């Protein structure tokens, strides 16, 4: 019998959560991660499912996600412990046919529940499905240190944050040409912050929560982790630049335009036009 803990998606979640903790992005129970699956992914492991899956109602219906399975991190769970006990810290859930709730098919043992940011994740999945024609499958939230730091010292608007991150590392414009959305500070774990995040996810694969963290979206766990890692590396460079007295020279507007042309991407217009 195949064991679900050996599946590509459980092993992928173990690696992503372990790597994020080692980066220092997910202290204690900080951060959450969800991966949209297909029925064919989970079908071979039906023998591992709970005999009586628990049902949990959603705070709002998700008709776009009906009958869709996900693997998710648990509420109050530590990323550093996922590798030690995947079944206690992860769960496979499946949205019901009416989109009003979901069953926990596997994992989340001892009456654990999915991340408190599940509304933000599911709403963002809906928007990224539409924006990428189903290509994006991952939503990752973490407390990336230097990205958080920048929200204290830079004006919190999309064009400026995006432009500065592009200037912090040449690859950034290529990796996230659609820029970085940013919210006002909001109480986490609510439908309101979920809706605001999803609205930004219509236009951006990265969304900053000031003084808190970042949301990233991508087609795979590796791509999503790499997206956040790239932005965080640039933020680290910027933090060092500002601590040394600021920029004396940087990548120019003309050079950013040339970079976009070379790699066949269309940079966020408002960030290019900023100065």
From Swiss-Prot:
Protein name: Rhamnulose-1-phosphate aldolase
SMART domains: Aldolase_II
Pathway, per record: Carbohydrate degradation; L-rhamnose degradation; glycerone phosphate from L-rhamnose: step 3/3
Similarity comment: family membership: Belongs to the aldolase class II family. RhaD subfamily.
EC numbers, comma separated: 4.1.2.19
Gene Ontology cellular component list: cytosol
GO biological process: pentose catabolic process; rhamnose catabolic process
Residue ranges crossing the lipid bilayer per the database entry: none
Cofactor note: Binds 1 zinc ion per subunit.
């Amino acid at each position: 019998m195949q064991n679900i803990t050996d599946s590509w998606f459980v092993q992928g979640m173990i690696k992503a959560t372990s790597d994020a903790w080692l980066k220092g992005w997910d202290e204690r129970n900080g951060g959450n991660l969800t991966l949209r699956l297909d029925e064919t992914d989970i079908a071979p492991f039906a023998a591992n499912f709970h005999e009586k899956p628990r049902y949990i109602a959603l705070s709002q219906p998700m008709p776009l996600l009906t009958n869709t399975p996900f693997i998710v991190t648990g509420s109050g769970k530590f990323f550093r412990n996922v590798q030690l006990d995947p079944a206690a810290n992860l769960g496979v859930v499946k949205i019901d046919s009416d989109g009003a709730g979901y069953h926990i098919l596997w994992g989340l043992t001892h009456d654990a529940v999915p991340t408190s940011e599940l509304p933000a994740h599911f709403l963002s999945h809906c928007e990224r499905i539409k924006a990428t024609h189903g290509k994006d499958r991952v939503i990752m939230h973490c407390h990336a240190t230097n990205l958080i730091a920048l929200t204290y010292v830079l004006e919190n608007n999309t064009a400026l944050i995006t432009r500065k991150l592009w200037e912090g590392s040449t690859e950034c414009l290529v990796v996230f040409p659609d820029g970085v959305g940013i919210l006002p500070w909001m109480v986490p774990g609510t439908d309101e912050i979920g809706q605001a995040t999803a609205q930004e996810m219509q236009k951006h694969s990265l969304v900053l929560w000031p003084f808190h963290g970042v949301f990233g979206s991508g087609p795979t766990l590796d791509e999503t982790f790499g997206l956040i890692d790239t932005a965080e590396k640039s933020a680290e460079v910027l933090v060092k630049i500002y601590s040394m007295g600021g920029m004396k020279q940087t990548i120019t507007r003309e050079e950013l335009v040339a970079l976009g042309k070379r790699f066949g991407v269309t940079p966020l217009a408002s960030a290019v036009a900023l100065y």
